[in-house]
Structures are given as C-alpha cells and as structure tokens.
Amino acid sequence: MTVSSIFPPAADKTALERGAAIMPRFDANGLVAAIAQHADTGEILMFAWMNDEALKLTLDTGIAHYFSRSRNSLWKKGETSGQLQIVTELRIDCDQDAVLIKVRPQGDGGACHVGFRSCFYRVWENGALVEREA
C-alpha cells in the first residue's frame, strides 16, 4: 500500500470503515480502482485507475480525472473527445480501495475510446465474445 501525500491515512479500522473522512487505500503503485456509472441509467461505463492527484481533481472540479498506466500520466476524461464526465456522486467502498463515480457523460455520451457508449460492449456467448451495446 502506498501512502498518499494528499489524503491522510486511516487512524484505525473504524475510521476507515465508518468515518466521514475520505482516506483511500492506494495499492503498491499508488492507485485505486474506479468504476464510472451513468448517473441516470445505472449503466456501467468504464473501469479505470486513479492516483491521489486524479481523485483530488475529481473531488475539487466535479469532472472525472483518471490515471493512465500506459501513459503514466493524469487523464481528464473527455478533454480531447468532448466526452467529459460530470460527477454527480462519488462513493467509496467499505475499505476505501475502490471508488464508484456516478457521472453524466457529455458530448455524444460515449465513454469508450473504441467508440461505444460503455467499455463493456462485449458479451461472452457460446464460447466467443460478441459485440453488443447494453
């Protein structure tokens, strides 16, 4: 687990699980899992990673920011595509190692860089992946 320079560590298990402060438990690479969910439809749009700076920017700006492992850099979702994700609610799980971000996608409403509304556009059927929008 990596210690954040932005968010304080949990004082104890009760503070972590029941406290009012956000104290994310970043992994050894300084990342926490993030799921983006459409605020109106409930559809899961994407999975990404956040470092402490991405999480702070998301909380401060109300626009989803992530951390790209392949580019090793911050990534403001939709900055170039126009598909910004406006945050309506951010939830953190019981042990604070994953976040659920409810968003309203802007632009054409897409979230996937391949062009689909959701990154989860393939279904396993009869031994193969089949493309299918939700």
UniProtKB/Swiss-Prot annotation:
The catalysed reaction is:
1-(5-phospho-beta-D-ribosyl)-5'-AMP + H2O = 1-(5-phospho-beta-D-ribosyl)-5-[(5-phospho-beta-D-ribosylamino)methylideneamino]imidazole-4-carboxamide
Q: Which cofactor does it need?
A: Mg(2+); Zn(2+)
Compartments (UniProt record): Cytoplasm
This entry carries the following GO cellular component terms, namely: cytoplasm
- EC number(s) on file: 3.5.4.19
Cross-referenced Pfam families? PRA-CH (PF01502)
Q: How is the cofactor bound?
A: Binds 1 Mg(2+) ion per subunit.
Q: Which domain of life is it from?
A: Bacteria
Q: Key word Repressor present in the record?
A: no
Q: Where does Mg(2+) bind?
A: D93, D95, D97
Under the heading InterPro entries, the entry gives: PRA-CH (IPR026660), PRib_AMP_CycHydrolase_dom (IPR002496), PRib_AMP_CycHydrolase_sf (IPR038019)
Q: What class of enzyme is it?
A: hydrolase
Pathways involved: Amino-acid biosynthesis; L-histidine biosynthesis; L-histidine from 5-phospho-alpha-D-ribose 1-diphosphate: step 3/9
Record keywords: Amino-acid biosynthesis, Cytoplasm, Histidine biosynthesis, Hydrolase, Magnesium, Metal-binding, Zinc
Q: Which residues bind Zn(2+)?
A: C94, C112, C119
Q: Name one GO biological process term.
A: L-histidine biosynthetic process
Keyword Signal recorded = no
GO MF assignments: magnesium ion binding; phosphoribosyl-AMP cyclohydrolase activity; zinc ion binding
Which family is this protein grouped under?
Belongs to the PRA-CH family.
User: Could you tell me which NCBIfam families the record lists for this protein?
Assistant: PRK00051.1
Q: How does it assemble?
A: Homodimer.
Sum up the protein's function in the record's words.
Answer: Catalyzes the hydrolysis of the adenine ring of phosphoribosyl-AMP.
PANTHER family xrefs:
HISTIDINE BIOSYNTHESIS BIFUNCTIONAL PROTEIN, HISTIDINE BIOSYNTHESIS BIFUNCTIONAL PROTEIN HIS7
This chain belongs to which protein, by name?
Phosphoribosyl-AMP cyclohydrolase
Supply the source organism's classification: Bacteria, Pseudomonadati, Pseudomonadota, Alphaproteobacteria, Caulobacterales
